[in-house]
Design a protein with these regions (language model features):
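Ser/Thr-glycine-rich phosphate-binding loops at phosphate-binding pockets of nucleotides
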Residues: 157, 161-162
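Cys-dependent protein tyrosine phosphatase-like superfamily
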Residues: 1-152, 164-261
Length: 261
């Protein structure tokens, strides 16, 4: 039976990583890949904000998880106000790669979604992709760098900006759209925890109820986003190549993320 980075037995559907004060952490391993195989456990993790982590959470990240690279997709004003908590002094490569709707858009978090109770998530994700090519390609290159694994990437909720990057990574290596959409929808299991935490923080107060507006988590949203990515760009791999990733780097991404059979 495969094991995760903590050495515990895993199955493909058992990808949650539990922490005391980080609510929405999943290993990107165990997902099916077209033409056979699965994604590799213990390499890349997606997460909600880790800023409230405890000493025990830190010990798990630096020990069993083996965290070496933290990719922060939040905007500069979020980083300034919310910070990193204990991770601020950790021996971890920390890289801020803001994901926003356009290179010219405001760097204020509130401008990502002016009305959090009413938002077209497919349109938002398409704009985040278009406005953040440099950050997303840079994030992919950090994932490729096997000398600095494991990698954890996060935003605030671990759903939207994190979901776009996860979708690009997984689609680029051949994970089927249905599996990517199912992974995206898993955040719904933890959204009540995420909402309560974020609503208590200065940058995010006033969030709508769970499953409403920006807090919606439906697999169909990700299916539609991936369909648009395919129709407009030929899929994530072609989008990354158009954004400056080389064919050699794309091959290395696949080698890093796909487990040998």
């Amino acid at each position: 039976m495969p094991t995760d980075s903590t050495g515990e037995a895993t199955v493909p559907g058992d990808r949650w990583v539990e922490f005391a004060q980080i609510d929405n952490v999943r290993d990107l391993g165990g997902l099916p890949v077209q033409n056979g195989g699965t994604t590799r456990f213990g390499v890349v993790y997606r997460s909600s904000t880790p800023q409230n982590l405890t000493e025990s959470d830190m010990a798990k990240l630096l020990g069993p998880i083996g965290l070496r690279t933290l990719i922060d997709l939040r905007l500069p004003d979020e980083v300034e106000r919310e910070g990193y908590g204990l991770l601020a002094t950790a021996d971890v490569r920390r890289v801020c790669l803001p994901v926003r709707k356009s290179p010219q858009s405001s760097l204020a978090a509130r401008d990502l979604v002016p009305d959090s109770s009413r938002v077209d998530l497919v349109d938002l994700y398409d704009k985040l992709l278009a406005g953040s090519a440099e950050s997303i390609v840079a994030a992919v290159r950090l994932v490729i760098d096997a000398g600095h694994h494991s990698v954890l990437f996060h935003c605030a909720a671990g759903k939207d900006r994190t979901g776009v990057l996860a979708a690009v990574l997984l689609d680029a290596v051949g994970v089927p759209p249905e599996a990517i959409a199912a992974d995206y929808a898993l955040t719904g299991e933890r959204m009540h925890l995420v909402r309560d935490r974020l609503d208590a923080l200065p940058s995010y107060a006033g969030l709508p109820p769970v499953s409403t507006g920006i807090l919606g988590v439906e697999a169909e949203v990700m299916r539609r986003f991936l369909a648009k990515l395919s129709a407009d760009h030929g899929g994530a791999a072609e989008w990354l190549l158009a954004g400056g990733l080389t064919t050699g780097e794309l091959a290395r991404l696949r080698a890093v993320l796909i487990a040998p059979e």
